[in-house]
Amino acid sequence: ILILIIVCNYFSLQILNYKKYNIKAGNNSLRKIILKAPRGIIYDRNEIPIVDNKLIYNINIIPKDFNSNTFNYNLIDRTININKKTIDSIVYSNNTSVKQFRPYLIKSNIDFMKKSILEESKLDIKGLYFTNSPIRTYTSSCNLAHVLGYLRDLDQIEGYSGIEKHYEEVLKGSDGLEYHLVDRFGIDQGLFIDDNIKRPEQGKSVYLSIDSGLQSYSEEIMGENIGSIIVMDPKTGEVLTMLSTPSYELNSFAGEIPIKTWNKLIKNKDKPFNNRAIQSSYPPGSIFKLILASIVLDKKIISKDWKINCNGKYEFYDKVFHCWKEDGHGIVNLNNAIKGSCNIYFYNLIQKIDFDLWSDEVLNFGFGNILGV
């Protein structure tokens, strides 16, 4: 039995695990690389992509491979504007027996030129290595910040608001895994091919009811004003446009958000993070004129030709209510009253229906209900 055990171990060392132990014998080691999965693409109703992904370069550091005596701090400071204090803080705060083998992000979204400069001096920056990762890119000319939402990097990238948050489980992909050979200087020697390689799987796509062309037109109309615009398909209830202003630039949230940019947004008295289309309460105002018109026509209480004389004011007991047009609209029928938003016409019209009927019909139109948007 003893001989059999020895033979089995010998077979394992020399045949089954030869590749792994041969790496270690040659002063090489394996580095585990997590391959971040791209999120699903978000399309508008016409299958135009409005959120996609692009690859960026990130630079990481492994404390175990770092040597402060030979590390070229000046090169890093000149190239990517990361000083010695920042690097040492990351290294020495994670230099425990377990943490020292893990990679820690130094800087993300490095351009190819800077990456090339640093890679030419690998021996002077031992402990640093590059990875690729996907970030969001916004391909549409329209600004859908409040609808789409943005991502946050907590333990992992995930949707923090809007569509990105609501459809997190659909949009997020499945990360991949591979191992790289690393020599005794900590320099990457290429991919180690074995059965543990797992390719990242992209998240599933999401298709919105939003019309990006109509959204852009709404932004043009709104200009610099503060407010919101919602356009819906009256037959299906689909939201074609949802605009809230002021807004914010989503590309600022694709990578690291500069502190100045973040502080400026959260301190803005006009609250650009507030989605005025669905997160604020407003008196319904003239929208009730359309509801009232629909009810009286449906119940055949009046015809569209029913007329009144608008002289600019309406007396109700001891109260006087005014039209927005001080000198009045004159003789108006239903069509003209809607076109001119005549207050006096609808003050008269509301007197023709029962209060209980009004209450029931308004609820039937969905007022007071949670929309699920």
PLM feature segments, named:
Residues D188-S228, M232-K235:
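Conserved, well-ordered alpha-helix/loop/beta-strand core segments that scaffold catalytic motifs
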Residues I1-K20:
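Hydrophobic alpha-helical transmembrane signal-anchor segments
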Residues I33-I80:
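Juxtamembrane extramembrane loops of integral membrane proteins
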Residues V51, D183-I197, P234-I287, I291-V373:
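Beta-lactam-recognizing serine transpeptidase/beta-lactamase-like catalytic domain environment
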